[in-house]
């Protein structure tokens, strides 16, 4: 299980990403606009750089919601492969059962 501090840190990053998502998207769309002059582009880039570093979606890490594990996480379910297996074997995931042929 991951340290509680890592889980809390990732949670705070997620809040920051959601908070600045629209602003970042607006600035990036303005940046990709082809009719902007170089001065305007530099101003937009400066505004983008002033946003918090942790508000970038690329800084997020997929973590298991139950254990905090960072590797082997199924993004659809947001749980690690170990937890997924245990839940499936105990019958706690509806529609999921062990394969047999």
UniProtKB/Swiss-Prot annotation:
Major subcellular location class: plastid
Taxonomic superkingdom: Eukaryota
One Pfam family named in its UniProt record: Ribosomal_S14
Location of this chain's protein in the cell: Plastid
Cellular compartments per GO CC: plastid; small ribosomal subunit
InterPro entries: Ribosomal_uS14, Ribosomal_uS14_bac/plastid
GO terms assigned for molecular function: rRNA binding; structural constituent of ribosome
Keyword field: Plastid, Ribonucleoprotein, Ribosomal protein, RNA-binding, rRNA-binding
GO biological process: translation
Plastid among keywords: yes
Family: Belongs to the universal ribosomal protein uS14 family.
Function: Binds 16S rRNA, required for the assembly of 30S particles.
Subunit text: Part of the 30S ribosomal subunit.
NCBIfam families, sorted: PRK08881.1 (NF006477)
Protein's UniProt name: Small ribosomal subunit protein uS14c
Chain's gene name: rps14
